[in-house]
């Protein structure tokens, strides 16, 4: 929501259009025959609401239970300080790029748009590790990983 970049503003766009469009995006999607939603929380750069987008992940899951995620890997590429820093410290870039995906996962995200396909070799093991952490954390509350979960494939 360009008019209200808060959690409430993001929810409002989906619910009723939040005064920026005539109806909510969920209603529009339903009218188009879409009934399986992937909720992208629209991450903005650091200093412009990136944290709000992550917090919106919890709100979306709590309110609707729909799968939620984002292209959070765009945050490091929009970070001016990191662009300068990586000129002398190239090793910092992939850590922040791949690490950003873990933030979305640990905030309850169901998917991450991890960036160009070249990132897959770094992103997949890191994201699998985060999935295993989450699986272990949820075990004592009765949540079991699905059969093809990294917990079973990689341990």
Q: What annotation goes with each model-predicted range?
A:
Residues 30, 37, 131-143:
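A signal for specific C-terminal beta-sheet/loop modules enriched in small/flexible residues
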Residues 50-133, 142-155:
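Active-site-adjacent loop and "lid" segments of alpha/beta metabolic enzymes
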